[in-house]
């Protein structure tokens, strides 16, 4: 297994027989790059894409 591959399992959970993502993917970078969750925004560490959370 690649270095850090164990930590990717934190972003998924199993509900019944399905695997569900906990975080969103970056729309610019594509699948596999998750958006980091901050207090007021979601941001991509790779390309800098930011979505602000609605109040």
Swiss-Prot record:
Entry-linked InterPro entries: Ribosomal_eS31, Ribosomal_eS31_arc, Ribosomal_zn-bd
Cofactor binding, per record: Binds 1 zinc ion per subunit.
MF (Gene Ontology): structural constituent of ribosome; zinc ion binding
One cellular-component annotation, GO: ribosome
Membrane-crossing residue ranges in chain numbering: none
UniProt key word Hydrolase: no
Cofactor(s) needed by this chain: Zn(2+)
Record-level GO BP terms: translation
Record carries keyword Ligase: no
Extent of the signal sequence: none
Binding site for Zn(2+): 26, 29, 44, 47
Pfam family, one: Ribosomal_S27
Keywords tagged on the record: Metal-binding, Ribonucleoprotein, Ribosomal protein, Zinc, Zinc-finger
Subunit record text: Part of the 30S ribosomal subunit.
Similarity comment: Belongs to the eukaryotic ribosomal protein eS31 family.
Full protein name: Small ribosomal subunit protein eS31
Source organism: Archaeoglobus fulgidus (strain ATCC 49558 / DSM 4304 / JCM 9628 / NBRC 100126 / VC-16)
């Amino acid at each position: 297994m690649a270095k850090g591959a164990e930590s990717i399992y934190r972003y998924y959970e199993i509900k019944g027989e399905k695997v569900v993502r906990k975080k969103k993917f970056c729309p610019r970078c594509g699948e596999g790059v998750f958006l980091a969750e901050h207090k007021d925004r979601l941001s991509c560490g790779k390309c800098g894409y930011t979505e602000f959370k609605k109040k």
